[in-house]
C-alpha cells in the first residue's frame, strides 16, 4: 500500500494514509466474507483494539504471535535492509502486553522459529535467573524467588496455569536488571522496570504454556503499579 500510494515502499511520511487505506480494505473484505491477515507489531492491548473493534461482530479473530527470543530478534534485525536497532526492539519488548481472549480473540497461536528447542531455551533461562536481586524488596535470588512462588502455589492447590506463571513470572528480570532509577540516574540498588512485559514475551518459548499463564505473568505487577 505504501508503494501504491507514494511509489516508494520505504516512505514513512504517509503512515496515516497507509493505515486508513489498509483499514478500509480490511473492513470491506471482511464484510464480503474474505479472510484477512493483518501483520503488525501490535504490542499492547490498545494497539490491537482498533483493528479488533473494526471487525464485524460475526468475524472470528485469530491472534498469531510470531515469536522469537529477544536476542534472535536483534540478530535478525541486523540482517534487514531497513533496521530499527536494538534500542527500539528493547523498548517494544518492554511494552508488550500478552494477547488474551477477552480482547475479542477466538484463538491464540504461537509461531516459533524453525528448529527452536524449548528444553534448551528453558535451561538457558533457568541458568540466567540465578542472579541476586540487589534490591531491598527481595532477599532471594531471582531463581529462588520464583521457585518459592511455585512451591506456594502448588502446595495451596492453585491451578496449573497459576503454577506455570509462578515459576516463570520473573524470567525477564536478568534482561531488565539495571542500576539506574526511573529518572535515568545511577542507583545503588537494582531496578527491573517493565520486567513483567519481558517475562511474558519470553514465556512463549516454554513448552505447554497456556495463554492464561502468560497473561498472568504480564499482569502480575498491576497491583503494585496501579495499572489495569
Model-derived segments and spans:
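Residue-level preference for the first positions of well-ordered beta-strands
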Residues: 35-37, 161
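Active-site flanking loop/helix segments enriched in acidic
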Residues: 122-148, 174, 178-188
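Conserved substrate/cofactor phosphate-moiety recognition/catalytic segment
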Residues: 1-34
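Divalent metal-dependent catalytic cores for phosphoryl transfer on phosphate-bearing substrates
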Residues: 152-228
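Acidic, metal-coordinating catalytic cores used for nucleic-acid/nucleotide bond scission
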Residues: 38-48
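Conserved GTP-binding G-domain of TRAFAC-class P-loop NTPases and closely related GTPase folds
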Residues: 71-121
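Conserved phosphate-donor/acceptor-positioning beta-strand/loop module used by diverse small-molecule
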Residues: 58-76
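Conserved nucleotide-binding/hydrolysis micro-motifs of P-loop NTPases
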Residues: 1-3, 43-44, 67-73
Amino acid at each position: 500500500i505504501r508503494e501504491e500510494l507514494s511509489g516508494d515502499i520505504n516512505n514513512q511520511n504517509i503512515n496515516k494514509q497507509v493505515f486508513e487505506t489498509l483499514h478500509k480494505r480490511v473492513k470491506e473484505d471482511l464484510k464480503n466474507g474474505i479472510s484477512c491477515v493483518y501483520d503488525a507489531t501490535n504490542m499492547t492491548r490498545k494497539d490491537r483494539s482498533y483493528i479488533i473493534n473494526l471487525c464485524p461482530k460475526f468475524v472470528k479473530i485469530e491472534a498469531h504471535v510470531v515469536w522469537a527470543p529477544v536476542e534472535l530478534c536483534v540478530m535478525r534485525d541486523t540482517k534487514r535492509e531497513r533496521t530499527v536497532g536494538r534500542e527500539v526492539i528493547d523498548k517494544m519488548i518492554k511494552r508488550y502486553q500478552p494477547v488474551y481472549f477477552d480482547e475479542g480473540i477466538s484463538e491464540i497461536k504461537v509461531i516459533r522459529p524453525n528448529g527452536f528447542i524449548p528444553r534448551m531455551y528453558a535451561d538457558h533461562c533457568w541458568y540466567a535467573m540465578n542472579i541476586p536481586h540487589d534490591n531491598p524488596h527481595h532477599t532471594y535470588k531471582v531463581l529462588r524467588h520464583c521457585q518459592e512462588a511455585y512451591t506456594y502455589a502448588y502446595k495451596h492447590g492453585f491451578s496449573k496455569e497459576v503454577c506455570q506463571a509462578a515459576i516463570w513470572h520473573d524470567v525477564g528480570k536478568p534482561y531488565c536488571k539495571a542500576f539506574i532509577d526511573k529518572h535515568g540516574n545511577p542507583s545503588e540498588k537494582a531496578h527491573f522496570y517493565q520486567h513483567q512485559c519481558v517475562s511474558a514475551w519470553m514465556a512463549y518459548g516454554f513448552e505447554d504454556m497456556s495463554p492464561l499463564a502468560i497473561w498472568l505473568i504480564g499482569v502480575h505487577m498491576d497491583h503494585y503499579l496501579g495499572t489495569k
